[in-house]
């Protein structure tokens, strides 16, 4: 294992008023561990393999939200990324919920080809997913909406997601309006502009950090007969 430069002293100087230099940024690296990925140890179905990794990430006390994922869409031939939360994984794919009038929803309507990234840095792991997003049924959206905390339900009504907002006060006023309309303890209806997307995967890649940047990358690709597993150069 090679020795990696220690940049924390430089960072402490930068935090106390010094400039964060290019050299300091370039020195920000660490060695990865010895745990590797072998094709023979991977499950035949990548969804099963993902579920196993997700459970392990959820048990890791350093990872705050194991179900957090970076969702990337396309707008005018340019990628747009943001973090959202995975709310269901099944044999069909990965499900998340959002405002159907949001920027991400408008982008999906034009181009449903999306990617997901699960960055489990403390475990030196990543999972990258490519697939096609489609809306889930209204009943599925409703079933999840009623399980949400009351404050989140009201927030879904109050926020015109991705629209311009003149001030924070305007948002708070909208929240108060809907909180009065649907008091805590009452049944809050599912907004017509709110629901879920199912991402049907076509490619799922599992990445494990290794020594000397010789990382393991195992990629499942969907074919007519099922999933094909292959290895990529790091």
Which residues make up each language-model segment?
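Binding-site signature for planar aromatic cofactors or substrates
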Residues: 2-234
């Amino acid at each position: 294992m090679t020795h990696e430069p220690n940049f924390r002293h430089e960072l402490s100087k930068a935090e106390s008023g010094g400039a964060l230099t290019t050299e300091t940024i370039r020195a920000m690296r660490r060695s990865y561990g010895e745990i590797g990925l072998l094709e023979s140890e991977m499950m035949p179905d990548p969804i099963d393999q993902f579920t196993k990794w997700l459970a392990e990430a959820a048990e890791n006390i350093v990872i705050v939200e194991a179900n957090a994922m970076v969702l990337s869409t396309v707008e005018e031939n340019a990628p747009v990324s943001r973090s959202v939360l995975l709310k269901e994984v099944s044999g069909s794919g990965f499900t998340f919920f959002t405002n159907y009038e949001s920027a991400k929803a408008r982008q999906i309507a034009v181009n449903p080809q999306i990617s997901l990234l699960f960055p489990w840095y403390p475990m030196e792991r990543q999972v990258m997913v490519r697939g096609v997003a489609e809306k889930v049924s209204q009943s599925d959206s409703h079933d999840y909406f009623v399980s949400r905390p009351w404050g989140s339900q009201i927030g879904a009504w109050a926020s015109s997601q991705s629209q311009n907002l003149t001030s924070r006060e305007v948002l708070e006023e909208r929240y108060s309006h809907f909180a009065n309309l649907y008091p805590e303890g009452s049944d809050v209806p599912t907004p017509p502009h709110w629901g879920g997307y199912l991402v049907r995967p076509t490619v799922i890649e599992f990445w494990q950090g290794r020594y000397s940047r010789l990382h393991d990358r195992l990629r499942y690709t969907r074919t007519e007969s099922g999933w094909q597993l292959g290895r990529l150069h790091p």
